[in-house]
Swiss-Prot record:
Segments forming a coiled coil: none
Sequence similarity: Belongs to the conotoxin J superfamily.
Cystine bridges: C46-C61, C50-C63
Protein known as: Alpha/kappa-conotoxin-like fe14.1
Keywords tagged on the record: Acetylcholine receptor inhibiting toxin, Amidation, Disulfide bond, Ion channel impairing toxin, Neurotoxin, Postsynaptic neurotoxin, Potassium channel impairing toxin, Secreted, Signal, Toxin, Voltage-gated potassium channel impairing toxin
Propeptide part(s) removed at maturation, as residue ranges: 25-39, 65-76
């Protein structure tokens, strides 16, 4: 029977790899066209984080140069 530590390690590794594979705009990562539903929550989180100025808290979000929908100003 696998130990709790090894199961936890495998789950964390799987989550890190799956996030890296479906992060849009990241250089060198695979863009899997069949996984649009997996990308949607991440892009929604990034849009909200960039809009509220909290994009720096999420390393997978790229907020530079995106227009702020509310004020039409450039987000930093």
């Amino acid at each position: 029977m696998p130990s709790v530590r090894s199961v936890t390690c495998c789950c964390l590794l799987w989550m890190m790899l799956s996030v890296q594979l479906v992060t849009p705009g990241s250089p060198g990562t695979a863009q899997l066209s069949g996984h649009r539903t997996a990308r949607s929550p991440g892009s929604t989180i990034c849009k909200m984080a960039c809009r509220t100025g909290n994009g720096h808290k999420y390393p997978f979000c790229n907020c530079r140069g995106k227009r702020d929908v509310v004020s039409s100003s450039m987000a930093v």
